[in-house]
C-alpha cells in the first residue's frame, strides 16, 4: 500500500490548451437475441464529461474501479468511437477523424499501460518493441537503431540488452520499456493508465521520478489515471474526480487535497493513509455505505446520492451541475462544502 507523502510544488504551466473534451458520452449497448439482435439496455460508461488539459501539465483522473477513467482515455485516443461529444487536439476537432488524418493525430498521443507484463509482446525483442512505432512511420531507416538505444538509455536500461525478450526483465524494467516505446514518436500527450499499480512499492517511486524527468525533458503533457490518490498527489497539477461516468469535482491539486468540497472526494481523501500515527488518529474518517450502482441503470438525480452522507430529497430529483459554488473550483453537489480532512 502506498502512503501519503509531501508532494512536490505545483510548477507554473502554459495557459495554452492541448486537449479539450466537451460533453463526452460513451454508452455500450446491451443486445438481446441471436439472429435478430435488438438493444435492450446500455452501459453508461462515460456520461457527459468536459475537461481540458494545458500544455506541459499533468491532469490526474481518479476514482474507483468502474468509474469510467480508462474508457475516457480510450475515447481521447480515438480507440473507441464517441456516442456523442467533441474532442479537440491543439484546437483541431478530431472527433470524426479517420484514415490518414487519424493516424497523424495518434502519433501525437501515446499510452503507457497498467500491466507491464501483458502490454509487451513476448515474441518480440526490446529493440523491436521500442522500434515498432518507428517502423510503422517509416523512420527506422533514418537512424532507428540509434534512436532505440538512446531511448533505452534515457529510461535507465542498458542498450546492450536490446536483443533480449520481455520475460528476461523485471516488472519495473518492463514498464521502462513501455515508457521508451511511448516516447519513440516524440508525442505531445501521454496517457498514463495506472502505470505503477502493478508494481512493487519499492519500484513505484523510481517510475514516477522517471515520468517526471522525461516530462520536463521532452515538454510532455500527461493524463495520469489512478485509483490511488497518494500516488496522484505526487505527480498531478490538477485533479478530476470521476464517479459512475461523471466528473464530480475538478481543481488544483492542493485545493482538492486540502479542502475538498464534494462528499465523494472527501471520502476518497479520508481513505488515504497518513504515515504519521498522531495525525492518523486525529484525522476525520468517512465511511461510505453500499456499492457503486450499476452503470446500466444509474440513479436519478445525483449518481452519488445512494452512498452520500449528505443526500436529501433534491438529490434524487435534480442532477447537480459541475460549477463553481463559491469554493474556488467546480463541483457537482447541491450541498458542496469545504472539509479539512488532514490535520
Spans of model-derived segments:
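Short catalytic/signature loops enriched in Gly
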Residues: 2-17, 30-37, 250-343
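The feature captures the beta-strand-to-loop junction immediately N-terminal to the Walker
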Residues: 62-63
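Helix-to-loop junction immediately C-terminal to a conserved catalytic motif
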Residues: 77
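Conserved ABC transporter NBD signature motif
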Residues: 85-93, 105
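Conserved ABC ATPase "signature" region
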Residues: 93, 143-160, 213, 266-270
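Conserved ABC ATPase signature
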Residues: 165-169, 173
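P-loop NTP-binding/switch modules centered on Walker-like glycine-rich loops
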Residues: 188-191, 195-199, 203-281
Amino acid at each position: 500500500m502506498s502512503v501519503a507523502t509531501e508532494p512536490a510544488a505545483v510548477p507554473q504551466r502554459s495557459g495554452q490548451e492541448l486537449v479539450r473534451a466537451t460533453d463526452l458520452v460513451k454508452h455500450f449497448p446491451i443486445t438481446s437475441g441471436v439472429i435478430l439482435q435488438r438493444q435492450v439496455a446500455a452501459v453508461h460508461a462515460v456520461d457527459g464529461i468536459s475537461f481540458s488539459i494545458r500544455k506541459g501539465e499533468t491532469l490526474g483522473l481518479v476514482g474507483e474501479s468502474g468509474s469510467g477513467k480508462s474508457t475516457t482515455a480510450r475515447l481521447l485516443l480515438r480507440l473507441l468511437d464517441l456516442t456523442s461529444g467533441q474532442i479537440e487536439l491543439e484546437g483541431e476537432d478530431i472527433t470524426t477523424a479517420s484514415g490518414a488524418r487519424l493516424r497523424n493525430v495518434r502519433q501525437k498521443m501515446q499510452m503507457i499501460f497498467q500491466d507491464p507484463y501483458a502490454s509487451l509482446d513476448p515474441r518480440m525483442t526490446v529493440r523491436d518493441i521500442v522500434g515498432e512505432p518507428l517502423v510503422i512511420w517509416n523512420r527506422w531507416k533514418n537512424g532507428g537503431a540509434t534512436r532505440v538505444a538512446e531511448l533505452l538509455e534515457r529510461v535507465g536500461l542498458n542498450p546492450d540488452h536490446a536483443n533480449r525478450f520481455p520475460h528476461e526483465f523485471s516488472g519495473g524494467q518492463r514498464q521502462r520499456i513501455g515508457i521508451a516505446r511511448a516516447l519513440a514518436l516524440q508525442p505531445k500527450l501521454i496517457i498514463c493508465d495506472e502505470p505503477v499499480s502493478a508494481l512493487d512499492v519499492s519500484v513505484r517511486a523510481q517510475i514516477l521520478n522517471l515520468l517526471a524527468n522525461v516530462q520536463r525533458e521532452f515538454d510532455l503533457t500527461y493524463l495520469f489515471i489512478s485509483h490511488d490518490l497518494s500516488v496522484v498527489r505526487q505527480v498531478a497539477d490538477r485533479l478530476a474526480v470521476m464517479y459512475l461516468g461523471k466528473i464530480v469535482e475538478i481543481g488544483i491539486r492542493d485545493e482538492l487535497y486540502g479542502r475538498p468540497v464534494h462528499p465523494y472526494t472527501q471520502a476518497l481523501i479520508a481513505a488515504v493513509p497518513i504515515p504519521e500515527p498522531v495525525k492518523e488518529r486525529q484525522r476525520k474518517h468517512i465511511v461510505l455505505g453500499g456499492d457503486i450502482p450499476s452503470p446500466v441503470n444509474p440513479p436519478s438525480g445525483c449518481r452519488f446520492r445512494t452512498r452520500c452522507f449528505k443526500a436529501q430529497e433534491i438529490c434524487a430529483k435534480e442532477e447537480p451541475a459541475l460549477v463553481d459554488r463559491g469554493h474556488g473550483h467546480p463541483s457537482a453537489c447541491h450541498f458542496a462544502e469545504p472539509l479539512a480532512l488532514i490535520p
